[in-house]
Amino acid sequence: MSGHSKWHNIQAKKGKMDAKRGKIFTKIGRELIIASKEGGSNPDTNSKLRDVIAKARANNMPQDTISRAIKKGAGELEGVNYEEMTYEGYGPNGVAFVVSTLTDNKNRTAGNVRAAFSKHGGNLGETGCVGWMFQSKGQMIIERNEDMDEDEIMMVALDAGAEDFESSEEVFEIITTPESFGEVREKLEAEGFEFISAEVTMIPDTTIEISMERAAGLQKLIDKLEDDDDVQNVYHNAEFPEEWEG
């Protein structure tokens, strides 16, 4: 996938996220609760929590909302117990999907995810049926401007342990292992760089190009899944046309 096409897909997703800001805060709040519950409420000693806090800040989540979620996870405030569940399957046109969820009711979530796939031309599969097509990677996106020195950003990222660095007219994309994500992000933040997005994600090894004629049908499935409060992330290997507006 070309850098420009990657950015187009990221940009389209970001536009949708901006329109659903309250829902995004709810989803990130659940991630904060889980991270705090599993590793404690101190980000200095909990790298997973540090990473989720960075994701929250990249999405302009208010600090008091972040703090409340962390306290719920640590048991300092009353909260709900969530379980992590992952679903895999195929959407229309053979597109592979990995759907990560945090739920307080596994039966409800499984039913909703299965119904979304069935209604929009897909099939929910067994665990592992498509997961092998993706790799867990840290991904940071920095919006490019004329004052930025590409070589400087690249050297900071690579020296800190980044695996890959790509640039386009609009953005710089930095890829890391999940283990080195936090360190690379912190080094870039220390140099004053701000992120459009910064998170550990699932990146497909190969992508399927989707025509304009088929894009709308696939987008309906993605939107249906992302609209579910229990769904945290929807990963797929579709590459939408550059002119697709979602």
UniProtKB/Swiss-Prot annotation:
GO terms for cellular component: cytosol. GO terms for molecular function: DNA binding. HAMAP family: Transcrip_reg_TACO1. This is Probable transcriptional regulatory protein CTC_02215. Keywords: Cytoplasm, DNA-binding, Transcription, Transcription regulation. It is found in: Cytoplasm. InterPro entries: Integrase-like_N, TACO1_YebC-like_2nd/3rd_dom, TACO1_YebC_N, Transcrip_reg_TACO1-like, Transcrip_reg_TACO1-like_dom3, YebC-like. Belongs to the TACO1 family. It comes from Clostridium tetani (strain Massachusetts / E88). The keyword Cytoplasm applies. One of its GO terms (biological process) is regulation of DNA-templated transcription.
